[in-house]
Swiss-Prot record:
The active site is at residue 115. Homotetramer. This is Nucleoside diphosphate kinase. Keywords: ATP-binding, Cytoplasm, Kinase, Magnesium, Metal-binding, Nucleotide metabolism, Nucleotide-binding, Phosphoprotein, Transferase. One of its GO terms (molecular function) is nucleoside diphosphate kinase activity. It holds the Pfam family NDK. Its cofactor is Mg(2+). Its EC number is 2.7.4.6. It is found in: Cytoplasm.
């Protein structure tokens, strides 16, 4: 089973969208194996967005992601990365397909409600950055026996 990292950003948390997003994830069949509400500090934000250091939008990005709590999750399932990315929609909500999280709940690229790993390498890095191994659980969903 593939794992991926997904985070409801401060705008999503502040707008009360955690429950709606978790519901969509679970209805799609992905399993949440770790989750926590947390406040990201600057040090963690810089590690998370290290590939953007030096870019013109970096300080705004750090300021936004540290502006309020986030809900961090590890999801597990077949093709979890691609599935989560399809559910989220394109980074620019105006280009996202109808029915995706970003199309339904976001209006601006810089405030687009949700983040998700874009590759197995970034998923591994982000999971290790936000979760200790003992925070990631292994369990069987009741429905798994019926599938």
């Amino acid at each position: 089973m593939e794992q991926t990292y997904v985070m409801v950003k401060p705008d999503g948390v502040e707008r009360g969208l955690i429950g709606e997003i978790v519901t969509r994830i679970e209805k799609k069949g992905l399993k949440i194996v770790a989750g926590k509400l947390m406040q990201i500090d600057r040090e963690l934000a810089e590690k998370h967005y290290a590939e953007h250091i030096g870019k013109s939008f970096f300080e705004d990005l750090i300021g936004f992601i540290t502006s309020g709590p986030v809900f961090a999750m590890v999801l597990e399932g077949d093709d979890a990365i691609a599935t989560a990315r399809r559910m989220m929609g394109k980074t620019n909500p105006l280009e996202a397909d109808p029915g995706t999280i970003r199309a339904d709940y976001a209006i601006h690229t810089n405030r687009n409600v949700i983040h998700g790993s874009d590759s197995p390498e970034s998923a591994k890095r982000e999971i290790q950055l936000f979760f200790a191994p003992q925070e990631i659980l292994s369990y069987q969903k009741a429905i798994d026996t019926w599938i």
